[in-house]
């Protein structure tokens, strides 16, 4: 995930001002958690962002998923870029991209930019997006530091129930509905 400077500055300023920080700051992990909350629940109230972040943390704690926030969010099949394929390059110099619509969180492999567009093309700040991003960062920091009420129990899944009903949802139990998302566990 590429971090833009305005998004990074918001992350840095908020993380340094939160009272009661209990863990060392891992900006990359917090950024991944905040980006997921932003893209999955940006138009929802604060509790929606908290709930989405809690699902990610539940997955990190589970033996069924990777044990880092960024790995949970980016989990799924990847393919090598045509720009590096077939060339004699070491693995670390090759570029890989998620396969469209085949990852755990739809925004990560939808084919659109994953940059937080705080700055407009004219250079001015888009305050609506900036405020949604600030809420997402704040939610991520609180959840990362376990400073929130548990809204989702042990849920490791959710979906936007007003838009889709995935096949896997029929095999799971519903824990709660928060705004546009239905939170599930098995």
What kind of feature is each model-predicted range?
Residues 3-13:
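Sec-dependent N-terminal signal peptides
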């Amino acid at each position: 995930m590429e971090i833009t400077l305005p998004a990074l500055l918001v992350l840095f300023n908020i993380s340094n001002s939160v009272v009661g920080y209990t863990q060392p700051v891992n900006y990359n992990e917090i950024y991944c958690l905040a980006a997921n909350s932003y893209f999955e629940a940006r138009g929802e109230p604060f509790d929606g962002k908290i709930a989405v972040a809690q699902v990610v943390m539940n997955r990190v704690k589970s033996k069924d998923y990777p044990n880092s926030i960024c790995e949970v969010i980016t989990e799924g099949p990847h393919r090598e870029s045509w720009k590096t394929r077939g060339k004699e390059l070491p693995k670390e110099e090759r570029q890989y991209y998620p396969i469209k619509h085949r990852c755990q969180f739809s925004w990560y492999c939808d084919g659109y930019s994953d940059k937080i567009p705080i700055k407009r093309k004219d250079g001015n700040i888009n305050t609506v997006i900036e405020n949604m991003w600030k809420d997402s960062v704040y939610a991520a920091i609180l959840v990362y530091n376990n400073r929130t009420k548990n809204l989702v129990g042990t849920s490791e899944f959710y979906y936007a129930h007003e838009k889709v009903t995935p096949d896997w949802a029929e095999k799971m139990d519903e824990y709660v509905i928060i705004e546009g998302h239905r939170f599930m566990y098995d």
